[in-house]
Design a protein with these regions (language model features):
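Acidic/aromatic-lined carbohydrate-recognition and catalytic surfaces
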Residues: 1-198
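Active-site-adjacent "gating/activation" loops or surface patches in catalytic cores
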Residues: 192-223
Length: 223
């Protein structure tokens, strides 16, 4: 089974983010794919019952209600984060995941927090935070910081996405099915990777393809 890129593309919190190749992170998975029921388990199933009920309405729509799906999933995840994260963050499996992925996870979570705070992924609009530094990351993500809960929220999401994709991969393997992942050859101009080290990218250029029979005007892939 070949998959389109499953990286997070959340840049504007609008339908424009549905383009799967405009990754804001080369590592982070997209919250769109998370199973709320799996995160809630039987213990917290009632907590998100109203949101899950709305899922049936969304599934009956003729097309994908991208913005609405994202809105309701994030609302449900915030409810679950509030009641689960303290215990989860003390578990050995989570601690191992965090330590092994800290190099990208921490900057990604801070980027997501700043994107939400300034309501834009354009880092040039982030005032004192437009230029990346490790000191900024450490300051904002400190457990003593006021911003910590909103940043840790993204740790929580990525950990559960990791568990769920791992489980799906293992299940597919048992059934003799190979998952073939499509990976974009570039990233979103307004993303955590370009924020961390803009010198690695040609930010004044975009990838694409010249005119051919498939696209007579050529293609601009937007990354």
């Amino acid at each position: 089974i070949q998959l389109l890129p499953v990286n997070d593309t959340t840049s504007t919190h609008t339908k424009a983010d549905s383009y799967p190749y405009a990754a804001i992170s080369a590592f982070a998975l997209h919250p769109l794919y998370i199973s709320l029921e799996a995160v809630a388990g039987t213990t917290h199933k009632k907590l998100i019952s109203k949101i899950i009920a709305h899922k049936k309405e969304l599934n009956q729509a003729e097309g994908v209600c991208y913005e609405e799906v994202m809105k309701y999933k994030l609302e449900a995840l915030k409810l679950l984060f509030d009641v689960q994260h303290k215990d989860l963050f003390e578990q050995a499996d989570y601690i191992n995941f965090y330590q092994q992925n800290k190099s990208w996870l921490q900057p990604y979570a801070v980027f997501s927090y700043l994107r939400d705070t300034y309501k834009t992924a354009d880092v040039s609009q982030w005032e004192d935070f437009q230029f990346f530094s490790q000191s900024i990351i450490e300051k904002l993500s400190s457990p003593q910081s006021k911003s910590y809960p909103k940043i840790a929220f993204y740790y929580f999401i990525q950990y559960h996405l990791h568990l769920q994709l791992k489980q799906a991969h293992e299940y597919a393997n048992k059934k003799g099915i190979v998952l073939k992942g499509d990976i974009a050859i570039g990233v979103n101009k307004h993303g955590v990777d370009t924020w961390m080290d803009p010198t690695l990218y040609h930010l004044d250029m975009q990838a694409g393809a010249p005119p051919d029979d498939f696209a007579i005007k050529g293609q601009n892939w937007g990354f």
